[in-house]
Amino acid sequence: MEQFLLSLLRHIAYNFPQLSLVAEDCGQLDTQEDNYPVTFPCVLVGNTDISWSDLDEQGSSQRGTATITVRLAIDCYDDVHIGSTQESSIADRYRLASELHNSLQSLEFEDLPDIYPLSRQRSRDYTLPGNIKIYESTYSFLISS
């Protein structure tokens, strides 16, 4: 699983050089502390959850249905009300979120044959204090061990 997470982070960082940070989600956005400063725009990946089932009677082989959450965080300091001349920032944010999803949907890694392609299960957007807009998607995939 750790190789999958590293491969996913590398894929995002390589395909989205405009991101200032691509990292495992360790709660960086949920704290007011400056110990681990977050720069924007960024993508944080984590909150993995796997439900396992045995493929044989001995339990030596298993298949799991996993989910992982990808959060794109963007600083929305710009005044984006209609007539503000910054209205295009809204479209730019949604475009980046869409491009990120398009790069992840059906993503598979040749060097990880036990990980099956990603499939988006849900998405939402919300705002954190400090004008930080979050575009969050949860992807599912199968994993064998």
Where are each of the predicted segments found?
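Charged, amphipathic alpha-helical segments and their flanking helix caps
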Residues: 1-37, 48-145
